[in-house]
Amino acid sequence: MKNAFTLLFETIKERKRNPLSESYTNYLFSKGEDKILKKIGEECTEVIIASKNNDNEELVKEMVDVMYHCFVLLAEKNISLEDIMEEVTERNGKLSRVGDRREIDTL
């Protein structure tokens, strides 16, 4: 049985291959990468607001929106979930130290 993430990603890829005129996913693909990236930015802002408001129910919903739009971006760039899982697996269990990260100089 496939998990919800796999099913969602497969649906997104299917919309890319076989567009439906009333599909929001198809709308995003038709507008291109800039629109997809704009939506990811908007949804990330909504995640921040929900978190700052301590609204966990809204936070879950907004996180799903971020993930959906990131999946659309992955499909747009022809990156598979397997590619993402391989990277997660590669990183899993590795020590990461604060000193290993570059400092953020400006925001």
Curated annotation (Swiss-Prot):
The keyword Lyase does not apply. The keyword Amino-acid biosynthesis applies. This is Phosphoribosyl-ATP pyrophosphatase. HAMAP family: HisE. It catalyses: 1-(5-phospho-beta-D-ribosyl)-ATP + H2O = 1-(5-phospho-beta-D-ribosyl)-5'-AMP + diphosphate + H(+). It holds the Pfam family PRA-PH. One of its GO terms (molecular function) is phosphoribosyl-ATP diphosphatase activity. Pathway: Amino-acid biosynthesis; L-histidine biosynthesis; L-histidine from 5-phospho-alpha-D-ribose 1-diphosphate: step 2/9. GO terms for biological process: L-histidine biosynthetic process. Transmembrane segments: none annotated. Its EC number is 3.6.1.31. Keywords: Amino-acid biosynthesis, ATP-binding, Cytoplasm, Histidine biosynthesis, Hydrolase, Nucleotide-binding. It is found in: Cytoplasm. GO terms for cellular component: cytoplasm. Belongs to the PRA-PH family.
